[in-house]
Amino acid sequence: MLLGSSAGGHLAGSLATRFTEDVYSPVDAADRQSARPDLAALLYPVISMQADITHPGSRAALIGAAAGPSLVDRYSVDRRITDDTPPMFLVAAGDDNIVPVENSILAYRAMLAHGRSVSMHLFETGGHGFGPNLPAASPASRWPDLLLAFAAAHRLLG
């Protein structure tokens, strides 16, 4: 299982959608093993590089603020989802003022369009960067248990 949040969610989503790409010449047998994760858990992730949806700082750092359409497509996780993308678990909060929740929705829709297993949990509140640190009374505090249940449903837990 692979987990990433915010910009780390983009990294995790990229690995989940680009694991077949050759990024270096193999040195030994380990380099020939699949890099496909069994499950990708993305928390309030940066998914899209589209200027009106992305986190501007992430886009500027990764592809540049003035990047053209081909770079936007290449680095937008939702546009890289295929029929081979592993199951995906998404968590976001509607009041996230850092990474628009539309990012998670785009990933969810793309997973459905490719018939992939996906579980999205969109909470009313939680903001950005909450991780496992929310008060127990907050509905978003349940995401770790929801992730474990999703992983168990995919037989990834003992």
PLM regions with names:
Residues 1-54, 72-73:
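Primarily recognizes the serine-hydrolase "nucleophile elbow" in alpha/beta-hydrolase
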Residues 18-20, 57-60, 106-110:
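Glycine-rich, phosphate-binding/catalytic loops in enzymes
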Residues 26-30, 65-80, 85-86:
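Active-site nucleophile elbow and catalytic-triad environment of alpha/beta-hydrolase enzymes
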Residues 36-39, 85-87, 114-119:
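Loop/turn elements at helix/coil->beta-strand transitions in domains of secreted/extracellular proteins
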Residues 49, 95-99:
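Acidic catalytic loop of the alpha/beta-hydrolase fold
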Residues 50, 57-70:
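Mobile, glycine-enriched helix-loop/loop "lid" segments at the mouths of ligand-binding/catalytic clefts
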Residues 84, 89-92, 96:
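Short beta-strand/loop motif that positions the catalytic acidic residue
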Residues 91, 101-158:
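C-terminal catalytic histidine-bearing segment of alpha/beta-hydrolase fold enzymes
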